[in-house]
Amino acid sequence: MARLLIIDDEEPLCRILENAFREKGHIVETATSGQTAKAKIDSQVYDLIISDIRMPDVSGIELLEHARAAKIRTPFILMTAVPTVSTAIQAVNLGAYRYLVKTDSLVEDLCAMVEVALKELGLRQESENPP
């Protein structure tokens, strides 16, 4: 079970993703604005943050920058419906865990990506903190 934060200005998509991850046993919080997301990132600890890139008030890239400036190392999966090479490069350079293009199979793709991420992160934590 992991603690996830899902950030997207499209509330219906947030609810769909929230339900999908809750069904898999995860604890899920959502934010439908960048400002709300910033407050949650600053006050809570998450295992993984999933954020849309293009939002009206604060972009997913800006949220990632904010987290890194605050020394928050939580992995980010950034997703977008309007992919560009420059945005992908910027996301990777800032340390995004993954960059995902929103497609018709977004829920399935994201669920699979999150499970892989959590396994990798678990393995990484075990190697950094041996028994």
Regions found by a protein language model. Name each.
Residues 25-32, 40:
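Short hydrophobic/Thr-rich beta-strand motif most characteristic of the beta2 strand and flanking loop
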Residues 39, 61-72, 90:
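Short amphipathic alpha-helix used as the core "switch/output" element in two-component signaling
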Residues 52:
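Active-site residues of response regulator receiver
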Residues 14, 56:
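The feature encodes the CheY-like receiver
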